[in-house]
Design a protein with these regions (language model features):
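RNase H-like nuclease fold core
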Residues: 1-47, 51, 66-67
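C-terminal functional segments of enzyme domains
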Residues: 44, 48-143
């Protein structure tokens, strides 16, 4: 997961790279990137010339959860709790040439080997898949 904070001219002000456990989903990676981006930009709000931040994300599922259109996970709840006045969120389609999004995608790949380690709860979907796979394995051995 990764985020980039840019000024109005498109210059990088801050960035963050985060290595997530292998069991994490893309949804969790998007939520971590948004949470960490909000935490970072909260520190910048109120500095001279900094009135607001626009958080652009290609994570439509996380954005929908934040707006209440989907069930909000505890991780997305953390994003919502961290948001202060001066933040707005916008969806940008991924892999469509948006410079900031392309940069973040490249940083996210980099983060898989060199990012700051982040621990997250194991998602229910992952444990269900492990149980299902194990059940199939045992069944195939028996029959």
């Amino acid at each position: 997961a990764a985020f980039v904070a840019q000024d109005p001219e498109g210059q990088n002000v801050r960035q963050g790279l985060f290595k997530l456990p292998d069991y994490c989903s893309n949804y969790q990676a998007e939520a971590v990137a948004q949470r960490e981006g909000v935490i970072c930009t909260n520190k910048e709000l109120g500095h001279p010339g900094v009135q607001s931040w626009v958080i652009a994300s290609d994570g439509s599922a996380v954005l929908a959860s934040m707006k209440g259109q989907r069930r909000m996970t505890s991780l997305v709840g953390e994003v919502v709790r961290e948001v202060e006045d001066g933040h707005s969120f916008v969806y940008v389609p991924g892999h469509q040439g948006h410079a900031g999004n392309e940069m973040v995608d490249a940083l996210a790949k980099e983060a898989t080997v060199g990012g700051r380690r982040v621990e997250l709860a194991i998602p229910r979907a992952y444990t269900r898949r492990l149980c299902r796979d194990r059940s199939w394995q045992l069944w195939s051995q028996e029959w």
